[in-house]
Regions:
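Histidine-dependent nucleotide/RNA phosphoesterase domain, centered on the 2H-phosphoesterase fold
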Residues: 2-187
Length: 187
């Protein structure tokens, strides 16, 4: 494990386990530069670099999740989203949105509050989704939008845990720990 004095880049997310995840994986292989680095996910706490000790972070996440029961999520429809960070393809959450927003809010308190990005500090600024593409070239982006808007698959899962990953220098995701909902069981 990394030393306690080192800066560690982490992210906190949900890794849904859909029966039809191959549909998402195929889209991401085409359009998401991070497809080979991290599994399909919903970000709860965006990447941050800190010296927070593993045990300290575990305790914070366990406390943040204390009153959260496992819950169902449903995702469907891929939409385009342009912002200052790029041209994105988002798989939209249609069920489980309130629970995800509450977890996000609970996590960005205490020791993680200082790592909350400025762009997330406004009212209603967090819109949970699953990124399935980031396309720089405008022509390729327009093609990707047309290709993915035809996809009408529905993705459902019961969220039972939250994952904390370490992002290494190659942008690879290394699961540091997983905390179960309600019972805080460690996976």
């Amino acid at each position: 494990m990394l030393g306690d004095k080192e800066m560690i880049k982490r992210c906190i997310m949900i890794f849904p386990e859909f029966n039809n995840i191959e549909v998402i994986n195929n889209i991401r292989k085409k359009y998401d530069p991070l497809a080979n680095h991290v599994r399909p996910h919903i970000t709860l706490v965006f990447p941050f670099q800190s010296k927070i000790k593993t045990d300290e972070l575990r305790k914070h996440v366990e406390n943040a999740l204390l009153k959260t029961n496992p819950f169902e999520i449903t995702l469907k429809n891929i939409t385009s989203a342009r912002n200052k960070f790029g041209n994105y393809l988002f798989l939209n959450i249609v069920e489980g949105m309130d629970e995800i927003k509450q977890i996000h809010k609970n996590l960005y308190t205490d020791i993680l509050d200082v790592y909350k990005p400025v762009w997330l500090r406004g009212k209603e600024s967090y819109h949970p989704h699953m990124t399935v593409g980031v396309v720089e070239n405008e022509k390729d982006y327009e093609f990707a939008i047309k290709e993915t808007e035809k996809i009408n698959e529905i993705f459902t899962n019961v969220v039972e845990r939250v994952s904390i990953e370490i992002i290494d220098n190659n942008k690879d995701s290394i699961i540091e720990m997983e905390i179960g909902l309600k019972d805080n069981k460690n996976y």
